[in-house]
Amino acid sequence: MGDLHFLHTTPAQPWRVQALSAMTSAELGQALGGDDAADWLEAAAACGLVEAQLKLGRMLLTGDGLASDRRAAFACFLSAAGGGNAEAQNLLGRCFENGWGTAVDREAACNCYRLAAESGDFRGAHNYACVLAADGCIAGALRWFERGVAGAPLPARLQMLKALTHHPRCAVRAFAMRGLESCPVASTDQSA
């Protein structure tokens, strides 16, 4: 990782905060160790760095490196989503859908998923399509499923398509089967 002596100085300087927000959780933990990583991420998030808000929110949601705090995670995702981060918009939708740190609000979840999908987040597109399909808007759902699958890395694409093979709507199952047949890895994978 190189010489990271600068990390042990005040986190208020913007370039330091940006450098920290660009690190993965594992890199932060390695560079700073445990609580220091969380402190630096909190400082970066408080300075308004969207990536730090997103990263801190994920850590708080999962309890990775910090005690799980879904209310605080929700607040981080709300801030990052307000900064235009598509992944945070999707995660905010998950919070609304599942009641993580906030009251369950299906309409707010749908709006967050739509924003994430429109911003290019493949998970947001998938989640928005699931909401549309549940509401009976199959044509719209299929368009968003297609966009989500097209934008996903191969492992996520395969996971999404395999899950959709069990969807209650026949048209969605057919879409998933066609998608799996066109994936070179899926068509040669005998264990699936």
Could you say what each language-model-derived stretch is?
Residues Q30-D39, A67-C76, A103-C112, D135-W144, ...:
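Structural signature of tandem alpha-helical TPR/SEL1-like repeats
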Residues L54-K55, N90-L91, R106, R123-Y128, ...:
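Alpha-solenoid helical repeat scaffolds
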Residues E42-A44, L78-A80, R114-A116, R147-G148:
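Canonical positions in the second alpha-helix
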Residues E51, K55-D64, R71-A103, E107, ...:
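Alpha-helical adaptor scaffolds
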Residues A22-G29, K55-T62, G93-N98, N127-A134, ...:
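Hydrophobic face of amphipathic alpha-helices that form TPR/SEL1-like repeat modules
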Residues N111, A117-E118, A133-A156, M177-V185:
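TPR/TPR-like (Sel1-like) alpha-helical repeat modules
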Residues Q13-W15, G29, G33, A46-L49, ...:
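Short helix-capping/linker turns of helical repeat alpha-solenoids
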Residues L4, A152-A192:
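Terminal, low-structured helical/coil segments at or just beyond the last alpha-helical repeat
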